[in-house]
Amino acid sequence: MQGKLTFTSKQITGIAVLLALVIVLQAVGGTVSIGPVQLNFTLIPLVLGAIIFGPWVGALLGFASGVVVLIQVIMVMVPFYALIWANDPIVTFLTCVLKTTVAGFLSGLVYNMLKEKKAVLAVFVASAIVPVVNTALFILGCLCMTNSVYAMANGTNVIVFILVSLVSFNFFIELAINLILAPTLHKVLKYIKI
């Protein structure tokens, strides 16, 4: 697959399974709430796809995840979602779709750059990139929606509100989940010949 986007039927099947996992986990069950903390498992198939099939598949899986998030923002009656969609639909659209698309692409790209030198390190870095880029682009999107975010912040500093109320523990939990599962992903890669 070097330099071209052609896939065998076995690879297409693998991509389809990961795509279905991303969509289903994002739509109905990828998040487990424990108190104020949400354990998000939807990024795992995205990372796995980026590592196994490359950056373009990572981007495809990220795009699918972002579209599901966008649909949830539009359809689910959550005050924050309603506010940002009503006030900043273009920025909301771009934030939802681009954050995971870019994260998936960069994860696969960095993995490909590092895998020949240090395979285990490549898996860890690729696994960490997705929640880091996803969260960074979410924060950037929120900063572009300052008026909407300020309305939800109830007088709190917008940056403090974003970091404490919207990001806080979830980023660290997503990062930990990805980094804990990285060795497992690495072992899976050794046995899967797709």
What is the meaning of each model-derived region?
Residues Q26-Q38, A64-F105, L109:
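Interfacial aromatic-anchored transmembrane helix boundaries in multi-pass membrane proteins
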Residues M1-L60:
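Hydrophobic transmembrane alpha-helices
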Residues V22, Q26, V69, V73, ...:
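Juxtamembrane/transmembrane-helix interface segments of polytopic membrane transporters
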Residues A16, A20, A59, F63, ...:
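Residue-level signature of the transmembrane alpha-helical core
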Residues F7-Q11, P36-V37, F80-A86, K115-K117, ...:
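Helix-boundary and loop/linker segments of multi-pass membrane transporters
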Residues I51-W56, L109-K115, H186-K193:
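Structural signal for the C-terminal ends of transmembrane alpha-helices
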